[in-house]
Amino acid sequence: MGIQAAEISAILKEQIKNFGQAAEVAEVGRVLSVGDGIARVHGLDNVQAGEMVEFPGGIRGMALNLEVDNVGVVIFGDDRSIKEGDTVKRTKSIVDVPAGDALLGRVVDGLGNPIDGKGPIAATERRVADVKAPGIIPRKGVHEPMATGLKSVDAMIPIGRGQRELIIGDRQTGKTAIALDTILNQKSYNEAAGDDESKKLYCIYVAIGQKRSTVAQLVKKLEETGAIAYTLVVAATASDPAPMQFLAPYAATAMAEYFRDNGRHALIIYDDLSKQAVAYRQMSLLLRRPPGREAYPGDVFYLHSRLLERSAKLNKEHGSGSLTALPIIETQGGDVSAFIPTNVISITDGQIFLETELFYQGIRPAVNTGLSVSRVGSSAQTDAMKSVAGPVKLELAQYREMAAFAQFGSDLDAATQQLLNRGARLTELMKQPQYAPLTNAEIVCVIFAGTKGYLDKVPVKDVGRWEQGLLKHLRTNARDLLADITNNDRKVKGELENKIRAALDTYAKDFA
């Protein structure tokens, strides 16, 4: 069969057209077995630990177990479409996520993909999900308050910017409510800050292993209040694979570090880390890593310590930014001595302990002030708050102690009776409805009233009504006083004390 001249020229043209094109080289392996979200892959000899790999159909996975003849890969997605013999490609990049201001107001998954139906995200940069925490030299002591708007927290368990404060308690004790109120409370501060980025606080909420309906409800609340504008929600829900629930906190922290490293302030809420530990346990057991206490792997402490150490307050040379963390841990039957709770308590700078019993007594937020502590203490409070909040914790502690004794004895001396009366009113004063955060100045005035005896003659059942009336009075007739406390931070004594007393006296006369 002869070759025609036209064919020769066509072949030559084709060869010339393809000349100089480099062949695309991809390192590939083959799936040996797949199941339970784990794939064993042979042939990826040069893969790095934590590297992203790609399966057919665009499904991604992360190489975790690097063994002699195969690699254990956890799959970020549905493993039903992956079968034995499929090719797996190296991406040559460690798991990274988008970061930047474009993420604010959005809901994303553990890899930073939008899941809110509002279109793609134009992120300015990408950051590696699991990075090393800042060292000792770039850090600075926590000294700026991070207001939650909750009287019991801001007065007795103050949280500072750059602190890690654990919220711990049984299910249905109001852990998420405290976190959500903290996000909502930042709205007034962010609006007052205007263009001053050093005063604003951006919020990142990470939902780990929660029901989708719960996350949808939370996002709806953020949208209704306008808080979504400065908030990012990262959701790895109960229906997502375990690797996604494991990765989401790291990915969200990388997104939050963008603010910290640019001299701004961010707050990250992990809701909750118990479920991340369970997801990690599932992955580790399926990867055949040896189990330890409560079947958790040996490095479960490192899982949480390397995550929470990334929250820090940076010094001036590094931009003065901060990342504050509020990790949430769910206990079983109030047992704080279980493995994961004790681990996280030892990593964090204090804990807010919520009790079922208090919750059902109607004391909400159900904070057990005896077991709760902030290891940063009053250095994270304003001078005004510091001067009025000091006696509260002591008086409540004495009240709890005396209340236990008073059950046995009937005849009490006047001093003890006075202590019990004051304690009952202070306990009532610490109650606060959800979605009603107070400003720092309002809390100062309310606590001052409680500790200086303004409530001693008010019946316990009327304390809530008295407080609501006082807040209304302050917001309408004493705006100058609230502005003074906010703008000129100083101890409550002398002139300022007289101003507060005058406002309280005026209100006390009118209250009936």
Curated annotation (Swiss-Prot):
Gene3D superfamilies: 2.40.30.20, ATP synthase alpha/beta chain, C-terminal domain (1.20.150.20), P-loop containing nucleotide triphosphate hydrolases (3.40.50.300). GO terms for molecular function: ADP binding; ATP binding; proton-transporting ATP synthase activity, rotational mechanism. SUPFAM superfamilies: C-terminal domain of alpha and beta subunits of F1 ATP synthase, N-terminal domain of alpha and beta subunits of F1 ATP synthase, P-loop containing nucleoside triphosphate hydrolases. GO terms for cellular component: plasma membrane; proton-transporting ATP synthase complex. It is an enzyme of class 7 (translocase). Keywords: ATP synthesis, ATP-binding, Cell inner membrane, Cell membrane, CF(1), Hydrogen ion transport, Ion transport, Membrane, Nucleotide-binding, Translocase, Transport. It catalyses: ATP + H2O + 4 H(+)(in) = ADP + phosphate + 5 H(+)(out). It is found in: Cell inner membrane. ATP binds at residues 169-176. Transmembrane segments: none annotated. The record marks 372 as: Required for activity. Its EC number is 7.1.2.2. The keyword Nucleus does not apply. It is a peripheral membrane protein. Pfam families: ATP-synt_ab (PF00006), ATP-synt_ab_C (PF00306), ATP-synt_ab_N (PF02874). F-type ATPases have 2 components, CF(1) - the catalytic core - and CF(0) - the membrane proton channel. CF(1) has five subunits: alpha(3), beta(3), gamma(1), delta(1), epsilon(1). CF(0) has four main subunits: a(1), b(1), b'(1) and c(9-12). Belongs to the ATPase alpha/beta chains family. Produces ATP from ADP in the presence of a proton gradient across the membrane. The alpha chain is a regulatory subunit. PANTHER family: ATP SYNTHASE SUBUNIT ALPHA, MITOCHONDRIAL (PTHR48082:SF2). This is ATP synthase subunit alpha. The lineage of its organism: Bacteria, Pseudomonadati, Pseudomonadota, Alphaproteobacteria, Rhodobacterales.
